[in-house]
């Protein structure tokens, strides 16, 4: 075994390919923290929330609905940032800008914040685009979008993980069947 490993390590292309594969697979195991349409962490009033891990209805953040909060909506972002002000339904952009210093209408607010993954799209998130899909790479979609306006990079990350996990499971099952039969 040691001789085989030594020969493998001497083949630089094979050795570096193994390292690239291991790193890519390791990164893909944390796909939810890298590419997701839910925030990693939300601070709202006195609490911390992790929408990647747990379901939170919009009511948790001062909204009206019992369904899951759509964190990408400007109104939900306004509710979180301003501590649940009901004026967020009328002029969310203005309130978010005013909330930057922690004061709105000369009153202090419990300022909240949101930590997003580097790629704020899940593999199934359909994006609203200014042009027809598929779209070329831009600042929002680093590798562009596919023909149904979904982020290509997010789909690659999740697809790579799914493909490798499937290959590992098939290999283990085939080996087990081959040994037992």
Name each model-derived stretch.
Residues 1-175, 179:
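Gly/Trp-centered helix-boundary motif
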């Amino acid at each position: 075994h040691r001789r085989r490993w030594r020969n493998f390590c001497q083949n630089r292309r094979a050795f570096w390919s193994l390292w690239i594969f291991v790193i890519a697979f390791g990164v893909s195991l944390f796909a939810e923290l890298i590419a997701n349409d839910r925030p990693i962490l939300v601070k709202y009033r006195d609490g911390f929330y992790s929408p990647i891990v747990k379901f939170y209805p919009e009511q948790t953040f001062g909204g009206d609905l019992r369904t899951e909060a759509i964190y990408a909506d400007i109104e939900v972002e306004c509710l979180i940032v301003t501590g649940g002000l009901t004026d967020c339904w009328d002029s969310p952009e203005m309130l978010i800008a005013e909330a930057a210093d922690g004061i709105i209408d000369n009153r202090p607010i419990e300022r909240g914040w949101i930590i997003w993954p580097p790629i704020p799209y899940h593999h199934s998130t359909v994006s609203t685009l200014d042009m027809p899909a598929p779209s070329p790479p831009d600042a929002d979609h680093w590798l562009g979008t596919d023909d149904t306006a979904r982020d290509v990079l997010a789909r690659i990350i999740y697809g790579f993980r799914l493909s490798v996990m499937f290959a590992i499971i098939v290999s283990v099952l085939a080996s087990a069947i081959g040994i037992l039969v």
